[in-house]
């Protein structure tokens, strides 16, 4: 795991007190007329830094005045997670914010969005386009299907987060509403909307989701995870 757990109020204060940044990458031609401050990184004819620090440098360009600005946020309070030390498979295009915990051998697929304070257990897969809202918790060896949503709760600070147990399978495009707990070993059918807590070892389906059966050998076989996909 990679981060120190924060409760809702601590996350709110983290965001409120964070320096808001508009990070940019600027490729320019010509010579800078002024020295580069320590807050800006210059590599050849490329500048990296906050726009408020980079913009004055561009105004002082001499000779050619051509430059291209690349940016992906404005006044952002929470940076993206530094993934270099995480012992998991994270595919291109996943958006993971800072203060997220990711367990060993987890898998985060393309297009997944994971907000601040979320926790992902070891061996769990977050499939393509799935969304884990703020403080959402998923246990070990679970699978959150493509397009599924685990609602987040940063505000109100008193609200309880979504908690998903171990060995849970959440089907594609399912939605789990704020504060709901999914018991270990259970299955949420594709497209279900879960508005109430789900006990362990059951299958729920529908809108709103209802228990349709207990887990049996056939269900376990159909929903078994593939360890090979979690090999690093």
Swiss-Prot record:
GO term, biological process aspect, one: lysine biosynthetic process via diaminopimelate
A GO molecular function held by the record: tetrahydrodipicolinate N-acetyltransferase activity
Reactions catalysed: (S)-2,3,4,5-tetrahydrodipicolinate + acetyl-CoA + H2O = L-2-acetamido-6-oxoheptanedioate + CoA
InterPro entries in the cross-refs: DapH, DapH_N, Hexapep, Hexapep_transf_CS, Trans_hexapeptide_repeat, Trimer_LpxA-like_sf
Coiled coil: none
UniProtKB keywords: Acyltransferase, Amino-acid biosynthesis, Diaminopimelate biosynthesis, Lysine biosynthesis, Repeat, Transferase
This protein's pathway: Amino-acid biosynthesis; L-lysine biosynthesis via DAP pathway; LL-2,6-diaminopimelate from (S)-tetrahydrodipicolinate (acetylase route): step 1/3
Protein origin, superkingdom: Bacteria
Function of the protein: Catalyzes the transfer of an acetyl group from acetyl-CoA to tetrahydrodipicolinate.
Family: Belongs to the transferase hexapeptide repeat family. DapH subfamily.
Name of the molecule in the record: 2,3,4,5-tetrahydropyridine-2,6-dicarboxylate N-acetyltransferase
Species per Swiss-Prot/TrEMBL record: Streptococcus pneumoniae (strain CGSP14)
